[in-house]
Amino acid sequence: MNNIINEDLKNRILKEMETVFGVEACETWLKPLSLSLKNDILTVTLPNKFWSKTIADKYVQEVKSSIEKEQGGDIQIKYDVLEDTTPYKRPEIPPQVMGANYNAKIPFPSRLNPNYTFEGFIEGPSNRFAYRAAEAVVKKLGERENNPLVIYSTPGLGKTHLLHAIGNRILKENPYAKILYMSGEEFVSEYIESLQNRNPEAFRKKHRSLDCFLMDDIQFVAGKESSVQEFFYTFNALFESKKQIVLTSDRTPQQLGIDPRLSSRLLSGIVSEIKRPDLETRIAILRQKRDTSNFDVGDDVIAFIAEGVQASIRELEGCLFRLTTYCNIHGVTPTIPIAREVLSDIISMEEKRLLINPNSIKKVVSKHFKIDIIDFNSKRKNHSIAWPRQIAMYLATELTDMSLPEIGREFERDHSTVVHAREKIKEEIENDPFFAAQINQIISDIKAVDKR
């Protein structure tokens, strides 16, 4: 193996990790790490002592696997912490302020990504309320009418960007504000780590002394009883101290399945949904990414991508990166025919997704299970009806661009019933290969019907 990780290999690994964890997570947790390889030992240098080794390890294990595949052979992981080699110099303090009460101010390690700002966020009809609410939080930090702020959406629509933008704007106005960004998964991991180290008080002191707590993907805390309880007490401590709390989720507070006391707290502030961006917003997002990245891509190609990819901003930007990388490697200028070829798998999948009609789903599933179509909307709850209904609702979440409430209305059920059906069928598919094959056959039949 090479003694160091060369730049090409590092870039390839980073791109691969972005497909696994997403661009935002890699920017926050992977890029700040320094990696070197010597004598089959991958040394991972954490940027400071506050960095969670538990969280970093999740990303590093994937990097390790990627390097082993790339170069062959097993490697070991060793962790280190970056030391500040700058010689210590006592700060010059006027004699009148020196003494026992003197405390030098040190910026709090916020974990924020400085690239995510309000200025870099494209506002549109789909996200306007969430964007304006985020700005209001900064102007009236900790005020009851804006606290907490909960932003929810499907993945890849900009929730994390807004979280970081809030923190970065606060720090711009007050560099010594105690801001902390973390995911729900990280909260759980650090809490467990504090229990294992028999030092939960340090964990509580850290999280309950903040000026602003920014938590991404709170749904990861749900279902973990002791972590939910710890977060509830942390929430109360911050809320009663008039400190700001901003949370994101992939579902509404009512759908989280958490302690009703906490759910009630989350609903007491502002709850805002980010929907899929419309065509104009998608074009604006791609133009901004093109201009900031200095990509040579014409507006006609930008419009083609924006029209063909509607699922998420993350996927939009990923398509732009894929196209420009392909064109750079082959020395060609991006055109619509080239974009159509390079992005055919994504755009064709998106087109198929948007073409599926919920009536086609009902028709095929009812025929497969030998029930009447009207049974999907009936009040009957016996297994012979409820099971096909759950399958049909699951397929509607997978094969259409309908929102959960829209699917609920299609089946005359509420969105929580749709969520339950989706999770139940997903679990069954994962655990039963025969059932998974059955679902795949139903999907093929639905697509065949929809083409007629």
Swiss-Prot record:
<keyword id="KW-0547">Nucleotide-binding</keyword>
<dbReference type="InterPro" id="IPR003593">
    <property type="entry name" value="AAA+_ATPase"/>
</dbReference>
<dbReference type="GO" id="GO:0003688">
    <property type="term" value="F:DNA replication origin binding"/>
</dbReference>
<dbReference type="InterPro" id="IPR038454">
    <property type="entry name" value="DnaA_N_sf"/>
</dbReference>
<comment type="subunit">
    <text>Oligomerizes as a right-handed, spiral filament on DNA at oriC.</text>
</comment>
<feature type="binding site">
    <location>
        <position position="159"/>
    </location>
    <ligand>
        <name>ATP</name>
    </ligand>
</feature>
<dbReference type="GO" id="GO:0006275">
    <property type="term" value="P:regulation of DNA replication"/>
</dbReference>
<dbReference type="Pfam" id="PF00308">
    <property type="entry name" value="Bac_DnaA"/>
</dbReference>
<feature type="binding site">
    <location>
        <position position="160"/>
    </location>
    <ligand>
        <name>ATP</name>
    </ligand>
</feature>
<dbReference type="InterPro" id="IPR027417">
    <property type="entry name" value="P-loop_NTPase"/>
</dbReference>
<dbReference type="GO" id="GO:0016887">
    <property type="term" value="F:ATP hydrolysis activity"/>
</dbReference>
<dbReference type="InterPro" id="IPR020591">
    <property type="entry name" value="Chromosome_initiator_DnaA-like"/>
</dbReference>
<dbReference type="InterPro" id="IPR018312">
    <property type="entry name" value="Chromosome_initiator_DnaA_CS"/>
</dbReference>
<feature type="region of interest" description="Domain I, interacts with DnaA modulators">
    <location>
        <begin position="1"/>
        <end position="75"/>
    </location>
</feature>
<feature type="region of interest" description="Domain II">
    <location>
        <begin position="75"/>
        <end position="110"/>
    </location>
</feature>
<feature type="region of interest" description="Domain IV, binds dsDNA">
    <location>
        <begin position="328"/>
        <end position="452"/>
    </location>
</feature>
<protein>
    <recommendedName>
        <fullName>Chromosomal replication initiator protein DnaA</fullName>
    </recommendedName>
</protein>
<feature type="binding site">
    <location>
        <position position="158"/>
    </location>
    <ligand>
        <name>ATP</name>
    </ligand>
</feature>
<dbReference type="InterPro" id="IPR024633">
    <property type="entry name" value="DnaA_N_dom"/>
</dbReference>
<dbReference type="InterPro" id="IPR013159">
    <property type="entry name" value="DnaA_C"/>
</dbReference>
<comment type="function">
    <text>Plays an essential role in the initiation and regulation of chromosomal replication. ATP-DnaA binds to the origin of replication (oriC) to initiate formation of the DNA replication initiation complex once per cell cycle. Binds the DnaA box (a 9 base pair repeat at the origin) and separates the double-stranded (ds)DNA. Forms a right-handed helical filament on oriC DNA; dsDNA binds to the exterior of the filament while single-stranded (ss)DNA is stabiized in the filament's interior.</text>
</comment>
<keyword id="KW-0446">Lipid-binding</keyword>
<dbReference type="Pfam" id="PF08299">
    <property type="entry name" value="Bac_DnaA_C"/>
</dbReference>
<dbReference type="GO" id="GO:0006270">
    <property type="term" value="P:DNA replication initiation"/>
</dbReference>
<dbReference type="InterPro" id="IPR010921">
    <property type="entry name" value="Trp_repressor/repl_initiator"/>
</dbReference>
<keyword id="KW-0963">Cytoplasm</keyword>
<dbReference type="InterPro" id="IPR001957">
    <property type="entry name" value="Chromosome_initiator_DnaA"/>
</dbReference>
<comment type="similarity">
    <text>Belongs to the DnaA family.</text>
</comment>
<dbReference type="GO" id="GO:0005524">
    <property type="term" value="F:ATP binding"/>
</dbReference>
<dbReference type="GO" id="GO:0005886">
    <property type="term" value="C:plasma membrane"/>
</dbReference>
<keyword id="KW-0067">ATP-binding</keyword>
<dbReference type="GO" id="GO:0005737">
    <property type="term" value="C:cytoplasm"/>
</dbReference>
<feature type="region of interest" description="Domain III, AAA+ region">
    <location>
        <begin position="111"/>
        <end position="327"/>
    </location>
</feature>
<dbReference type="GO" id="GO:0008289">
    <property type="term" value="F:lipid binding"/>
</dbReference>
<keyword id="KW-0235">DNA replication</keyword>
<keyword id="KW-0238">DNA-binding</keyword>
<dbReference type="InterPro" id="IPR013317">
    <property type="entry name" value="DnaA_dom"/>
</dbReference>
<dbReference type="Pfam" id="PF11638">
    <property type="entry name" value="DnaA_N"/>
</dbReference>
<feature type="binding site">
    <location>
        <position position="156"/>
    </location>
    <ligand>
        <name>ATP</name>
    </ligand>
</feature>
